[in-house]
UniProtKB/Swiss-Prot annotation:
Transmembrane segments: none annotated. This is Protein mab-21-like 2. It holds the Pfam family Mab-21_C. Its main location: nucleus. The keyword Chloroplast does not apply. Disruption phenotype: Severe lens and retinal defects leading to lethality.
Length: 359
């Protein structure tokens, strides 16, 4: 058994050094290319409307606010200023969402975003996005990359298609630090020792983002009140939780396997599902010794088996917001196909470590 485990870890490390590193290098090259275009478009937006200031900056060869959805699909989070006059309200009525309401006694005119405040005093995510979409459309026509970039039509999201190969969503957002959403109050679970009080304090201080995008749970049937809501996102908190042991290596292997074998019709699975299941695996195996390099094979198998279970139950709860189902709206047939394909993949890795050479 130990010999088999060692063989799997050896093959996984080989897979990581060959396949995963090649994927990372290719994506890094794409990101540089994509960010040149996006920066140019955002510079043009800022000229027209100084409230939308580009926050896309390179730090230690990484772009702040850039999320990789898939090798040809990205999201850039554009951080907006001055949320101060609004109260953050999440009463759980919209899973995964919250609203920003003008603080009592504050005048609308005190807000930088005065014309996007609804009659009831809410800062409308939809109105801000609509204005931003108009500005981006104008910027695309004026920017120096206008021959290679165009807006994606038929969506309320702000999406660019670059060189007919890549899609980038640009999402206006507010960064919320020093507060923690009520809808995530159950985290961390009292009976689970991971991640420990110090890391919990760091994560909660890191806070979360509020994104102006279509809510998971409402796609296609939004009332105007609901579309004024903001989507909760915890990217920085999640990344902080995955910093030690072989967690990041495990995520890299999962993303590479997804890109190569689980890119399926109906798009049932994305990288975020992999990240979510990795976080649950951290809770199941709370000791740092469980995340030693020698345990990489066991952790990977555990996550793939959990993924199959989620696909069969057609439910994948968000890590911080368990009332939010990340499979919401996915076609059942696509989830079924993904379950079968994941099972084939897990069986192959488990029964024959050398199969990773071909995967």
């Amino acid at each position: 058994m130990i010999a088999t485990q060692a063989k799997l870890v050896y093959q996984l490390n080989k897979y990581y050094n060959e396949r995963c590193q090649a994927r990372k290098a290719a994506i890094a090259k794409t990101i540089r290319e994509v960010c040149k275009v996006v920066s140019d478009v955002l510079k043009e937006v800022e000229v027209q409307e100084p409230r939308f200031i580009s926050s896309l900056s390179e730090i230690d060869a990484r772009y702040e606010g850039m999320e990789v959805i898939a090798p040809n699909e990205f999201e850039v989070v554009l951080y907006l200023n001055q949320m101060g006059v609004f109260n953050f309200v999440d009463d759980g009525s919209l899973p995964g969402c919250a609203v920003l309401k003008l603080s009592d006694g504050r005048k609308r005119s005190m807000s930088l975003w005065v014309e996007f405040i609804t009659a009831s005093g809410y800062l409308s995510a939809r109105k801000i996005r609509s204005r931003f979409q108009t500005l981006v459309a104008q910027a695309v026509d004026k920017c120096s990359y206008r021959d290679v970039v165009k807006m994606v039509a038929d969506t309320s999201e702000v999406k660019l298609r670059i060189r007919e190969r890549y899609v980038v969503q640009i999402t206006p957002a507010f960064k919320c630090t020093g507060i923690w959403p009520r809808s995530a109050a159950q985290w961390p679970m009292p009976h689970i020792p991971w991640p420990g009080p110090n890391r919990v304090a760091e994560v909660k201080a890191e806070g979360f983002n509020l994104l102006s995008k279509e809510c998971y749970s409402l796609t296609g049937k939004q009332s105007s009140a609901e579309s004024d809501a903001w989507v909760l996102q915890f990217a920085e908190a999640e990344n902080r939780l995955l910093m030690s042991g072989c967690r990041k290596k495990c995520l890299s292997v999962l993303k590479t396997l997804r890109d190569r074998h689980l890119e399926l019709p109906g798009q049932p699975l994305n990288n975020y599902h992999m990240k979510t299941l990795l976080l649950y695996e951290c809770e199941k195996h709370p000791r740092e010794t469980d995340w030693d390099e020698s345990c990489l094979g066991d952790r990977l198998n555990g996550i793939l088996l959990q993924l199959i279970s989620c696909l069969q139950c057609r439910r994948c709860p968000h890590y911080f917001l368990p009332n939010l189902d990340l499979f919401q709206g996915k076609p059942h047939s696509a989830l079924e196909t993904a379950a079968k394909q994941t099972w084939r993949l897990a069986r192959e890795i488990l029964t024959n470590a050398k199969s990773l050479d071909k995967l």
